[in-house]
């Protein structure tokens, strides 16, 4: 496989992974991640759904139903998979769709799962179709079918699996096949975070990092973090570094402005790529409509990156319209870029 598979256990004395590296287990990867529902901020309906489902499953002494999370990247899907494993007292194995190139890769993982263990597949929409087909009986009947020989000599042998829980995550739920999508019992969409929830995350993370930050500064970071916890934590770390070296260790709004200017993040949270995306539509294509392939070719960026990373926030902020004839920059986008609205 091209990508690593990580295995975690709810037993604190167990190793993080059989394939761990310093990068995998570094402080930055895990130190800010909530360990339980009490510390998890946001996605309230999803959390409540999972609390109820987990409590019911534990009362019946059954594994949890299969779970599918979908939404933009960085909103806490992987973190919730860790919390589910901790709440259920089971082990968590993490992989991704592109890493499961062959059916044998998937089968090898499934056969090592114990009852109730969780298999988290990120980017599950990128599973090869031949690999995906092995999941159907595995999810529904907890079995995998092996076919031996071909033609009139073909024989099928069914191998029983322990009852596991599949947690899938995707940024492109529309690309999932109906047979796979319909096999998930719990289906939840992740939304961008409010500024209030992001400010709570900043306060919590700052406390864990030993930083002092006031309410004005937490809201300033929240405002410029694209509604995304992963980004707000990353920006907080950059601000921490900046004030440590350039600002006497004191976090102020002006220090945040200076630190984020170095990162190319403007007052609305747009990055250089976001602004280039909007400028391309306005300057090269008269404000649109224009197809995503044309935008990608002009920017020399992959269309998947634009669709998954750039567009969701621009749509949520009202800076972009996505129509049947293509993408259009809104009046708000013109104003933000300081360009005269063409109407």
Curated annotation (Swiss-Prot):
Mg(2+) binds at residue 78. Coiled coil: none annotated. GO terms for biological process: DNA recombination; DNA repair. ATP binds at residues 32-33, 74, 77-79, 140-142, 183, 193, 230. The keyword Cytoplasm applies. It is an enzyme of class 3 (hydrolase). Residues 194-264 are annotated as: Small ATPAse domain (RuvB-S). Pfam families: AAA_lid_4, RuvB_C, RuvB_N. Residues 1-26 are annotated as: Disordered. Residues 267-343 are annotated as: Head domain (RuvB-H). Residues 3-193 are annotated as: Large ATPase domain (RuvB-L). InterPro entries: AAA+_ATPase (IPR003593), AAA_lid_4 (IPR041445), DNA_helicase_Holl-junc_RuvB (IPR004605), P-loop_NTPase (IPR027417), RuvB-like_N (IPR008824), RuvB_C (IPR008823), WH-like_DNA-bd_sf (IPR036388), WH_DNA-bd_sf (IPR036390). CDD domains: AAA (cd00009). Keywords: ATP-binding, Cytoplasm, DNA damage, DNA recombination, DNA repair, DNA-binding, Hydrolase, Nucleotide-binding. The keyword Cell division does not apply. GO terms for molecular function: ATP binding; ATP hydrolysis activity; four-way junction DNA binding; four-way junction helicase activity. Its EC number is 3.6.4.-. Its main location: cytoplasm. It catalyses: ATP + H2O = ADP + phosphate + H(+). Has 3 domains, the large (RuvB-L) and small ATPase (RuvB-S) domains and the C-terminal head (RuvB-H) domain. The head domain binds DNA, while the ATPase domains jointly bind ATP, ADP or are empty depending on the state of the subunit in the translocation cycle. During a single DNA translocation step the structure of each domain remains the same, but their relative positions change. HAMAP family: DNA_HJ_migration_RuvB (MF_00016). Belongs to the RuvB family. The RuvA-RuvB-RuvC complex processes Holliday junction (HJ) DNA during genetic recombination and DNA repair, while the RuvA-RuvB complex plays an important role in the rescue of blocked DNA replication forks via replication fork reversal (RFR). RuvA specifically binds to HJ cruciform DNA, conferring on it an open structure. The RuvB hexamer acts as an ATP-dependent pump, pulling dsDNA into and through the RuvAB complex. RuvB forms 2 homohexamers on either side of HJ DNA bound by 1 or 2 RuvA tetramers; 4 subunits per hexamer contact DNA at a time. Homohexamer. Forms an RuvA(8)-RuvB(12)-Holliday junction (HJ) complex. HJ DNA is sandwiched between 2 RuvA tetramers; dsDNA enters through RuvA and exits via RuvB. An RuvB hexamer assembles on each DNA strand where it exits the tetramer. Each RuvB hexamer is contacted by two RuvA subunits (via domain III) on 2 adjacent RuvB subunits; this complex drives branch migration. In the full resolvosome a probable DNA-RuvA(4)-RuvB(12)-RuvC(2) complex forms which resolves the HJ. This is Holliday junction branch migration complex subunit RuvB. The gene is ruvB.
